[in-house]
Curated annotation (Swiss-Prot):
Designated gene of the protein: cysNC
Residue numbers spanned by region G5: 194-196
Region (G3), start-end ranges: 102-105
Family: In the C-terminal section; belongs to the APS kinase family. In the N-terminal section; belongs to the TRAFAC class translation factor GTPase superfamily. Classic translation factor GTPase family. CysN/NodQ subfamily.
EC number: 2.7.7.4, 2.7.1.25
Binding partners and assembly: Heterodimer composed of CysD, the smaller subunit, and CysNC.
Enzyme class, first EC level, given as a word: transferase
Pathway annotation from the record: Sulfur metabolism; hydrogen sulfide biosynthesis; sulfite from sulfate: step 1/3; Sulfur metabolism; hydrogen sulfide biosynthesis; sulfite from sulfate: step 2/3
Reactions catalysed according to its record: sulfate + ATP + H(+) = adenosine 5'-phosphosulfate + diphosphate; adenosine 5'-phosphosulfate + ATP = 3'-phosphoadenylyl sulfate + ADP + H(+)
Single GO MF descriptor: GTPase activity
Region (G1): 23-30
Name of the featured protein: Bifunctional enzyme CysN/CysC
């Protein structure tokens, strides 16, 4: 029993190193990790037995063990002989514990590689000695640099296939050191090895006596990862407001930087309220001091409104607070990122609505060149400006990974669609404030004797939106209502004449119209908006500009065949002939509303009958 306790204590104090392996397809990443696991005797007997069987069934090494099969766990990976998902493995030696991520080499899985790199202390970049640096080598090295991994190993693999030639290794090492210098990677260890044969993997190889450096495992065991900067100003992202009873109110989270003691002055962000730390807890134990990386609970001297997602920070050098930020964004979804489209941005425990207001440039991660872009496709990286609905506290990623990284979440599916690293805040509008007005929208509506709202008519071209809206407008006007129609065609003659019909410009088209409609509702009007508005995200954006009872979505539904048969403007014929591109229903999608306030079947009634349904919904039909 004592030996077990001693072993567990030894495991507790062993330092942990997280590292990734990356590089081009078939450079031997999975083989390298598998051989490390095998040589470090971290495999159970049943795993060894399974490996022998799998090597015969799936292996690529003839009668020999195929170490890569320890990592390639998906059936698709084994059948294709490639890595698709990020495979995490744990192993340890007498000196250290390791968590290693085997990242896929194919370009289409760059998002997976970035996921693995986000928490790594070091990166092992593999290069095939026969091929030298390839496009994916440069791509992965750029992402390694972008994500702030400071320790990089260049593992020139398959040296057995070039006769363990020194000149081949030195030429590749020279090329990579030049690339690393360009990317700002300063700490690079170049190691020649053979993952298959085990040369320079766990111990020095007799086949390469010309190499005087450490083996890969020796280097990783001795590596000192970047220590948490305890000299940095204290930052605590609040994950939980801890109130076990009415006598105790603490704020719990993991310290992202610095150290904290009782008596320290703090500021709460983004509110800016100032207080003082009274007590510090690590778990249930009150402590004098806590440092970065520890989970803590703080109590403060003052009753301050603090919620999950707020940041408690030292007063001398607090994080920046902004609602406009610049960041590198790696797009991870099949549907492109579009400026103006709204997402959830999750930074630590804080969640705010956000949109990309501008893509400054797209980065060609193969060449590091900056290119003009109007959207970001899957696996593309862009330098963007983001607009947030509320200010957030952050630290640039180069200084703090926790408070400098975020993810973007699709508001409809809740899928993670992007990841980013924050660069700086944009304060171009920090001196712009709301001007208080004595006459508000309630007073304007009262004098008109009506309840202002927006009727948002959406549907395919030719569905009858404009005709129905026009009839509703005439009937409301006859009843003494103050109304205005914003029609899609008419607005494009003035306000939106600079916009095309690309997906990007359609997003901006709806954003502008929603803002104009909001101003008109504030003026006390009943606004009828007649736009195709094909995308749910943009209609949701419009809805969020209004109070819950001010927005009425009217879906004018008609089969595409019926709308195309009408074709009053001849647009469908032109789209079919290829004279018009990005035409809704033909080569651009229409996303029907899921829960409209009113669903009109436009092929089952006249415009007058359908208009009556709208008026009935408003409670004015028959007046």
């Amino acid at each position: 029993m004592q030996s077990v306790i001693a072993y567990l204590k030894q495991q507790e104090i062993k330092p942990l190193l997280r590292f990734i392996t990356c590089g081009s397809v078939d450079d031997g990443k999975s083989t390298l990790i598998g051989h490390l696991l095998y040589d470090s005797q971290c495999l159970a007997e049943d795993q060894l037995a399974d490996l022998t069987v799998d090597s015969q069934r799936y292996g690529t090494q003839g009668e020999h063990i195929d170490y890569a099969l320890l990592l390639d766990g998906l059936a698709a990976e084994r059948e294709q002989g490639i890595t698709i998902d990020v495979a995490y493995r744990y192993f340890d030696t007498e000196k250290r514990k390791f968590i290693v991520a085997d990242c896929p080499g194919h370009a289409q899985y760059t998002r997976n590689m970035a996921t693995g790199a986000s928490s790594a202390d070091a990166a092992v970049v593999l290069v095939d000695a026969r091929k030298g640096l390839l496009t994916q080598t440069r791509r992965h090295s750029y992402i390694v640099a972008l994500l702030g991994i400071r320790h990089v190993v260049l593992a020139v693999n398959k040296m057995d296939l070039v006769g363990y030639d020194q000149q081949t290794f030195e030429a590749i090492a020279s090329d990579y050191l030049a690339l690393a210098a360009k990317l700002g990677i300063n700490q690079v260890q170049c190691i020649p090895l053979s993952a298959l044969e085990g040369d320079n993997l766990c111990k020095r190889s007799a086949r390469m006596l010309w190499y005087v450096g450490p083996s890969l495992l020796e280097y990783l065991e001795a590596l000192e990862p970047a220590d948490v900067d305890l000299a940095a100003a204290m930052c605590l992202p609040v994950q939980w407001v801890n109130r076990p009873d009415s006598q105790f109110r603490g704020f719990t989270g993991t310290l992202a930087a610095g150290r904290v003691r009782s008596g320290d002055g703090v500021v709460v962000l983004p509110s800016g309220c100032v207080s003082r730390v009274v007590r510090v807890f690590n778990g249930d134990t009150e402590v004098h001091e806590a440092v970065a990386g520890q989970a803590v609970t703080l109590t403060l001297a003052d009753e301050i409104d603090i919620s999950r997602g707020d940041v408690i920070a030292a007063t001398d050098d607090p994080p920046e607070v902004a609602d406009q930020v610049t960041a590198y964004v790696l797009w991870m979804d099949d549907t492109a990122l579009l400026p103006g489209r709204r997402y959830w941005l999750k930074l630590g425990a804080r969640m705010v609505a956000a949109s990309v207001s501008d893509i400054k440039h797209r980065v060609d991660v193969n060449t590091q060149e900056q290119r003009v872009a109007q959207r970001l496709q899957l696996n593309e990286l862009g330098y963007c400006q983001l607009s947030l609905d509320a200010p957030v506290a952050f630290v640039p990623y180069a200084r703090n990974r926790v408070l400098g990284s975020f993810i973007l979440i699709d508001r409809q599916s809740n899928a993670t669609v992007g990841a980013g690293t924050l660069d700086s805040g944009v304060h171009c509008a920090s001196n712009v404030h709301w001007q208080p007005l004595d006459i508000d929208h309630v007073a304007r509506a009262r004098i008109k004797g009506q309840t202002p709202k927006v009727l948002w008519f959406t549907g395919l071209s030719g569905a009858g939106k404009s005709a129905i809206a026009n009839i509703v407008d005439k009937r409301l006007h006859a009843l003494g209502y103050h109304t205005f129609i914003l029609d899609g065609d008419n607005v494009r003659h003035g306000l939106n004449r600079d916009l095309s019909f690309t997906v990007e410009d359609r997003v901006e088209n709806i954003r502008r119209v929603a803002e104009v409609a909001r101003l008109m509702v504030d003026a006390g009007l009943v606004v009828l908006v007649s736009f195709i508005s094909p995308f749910r995200d943009e209609r949701q954006l419009a809805r969020e500009r209004f109070a819950a009872d001010e927005f009425v979505e009217v879906f004018v539904d008609v089969p595409l065949a019926v709308a195309e048969a009408r074709d009053v403007k001849g647009l469908y014929a032109k789209a079919r002939a290829g004279l018009i591109t990005d035409f809704t229903g033909i080569d651009s999608p229409y996303e029907p509303p899921q829960h409209p306030e009113l669903h009109l079947r436009a092929d089952q009634g006249t415009p007058e009958q359908l208009a009556s349904q709208v008026l009935s919904l408003l409670g004015v039909e028959g007046k």
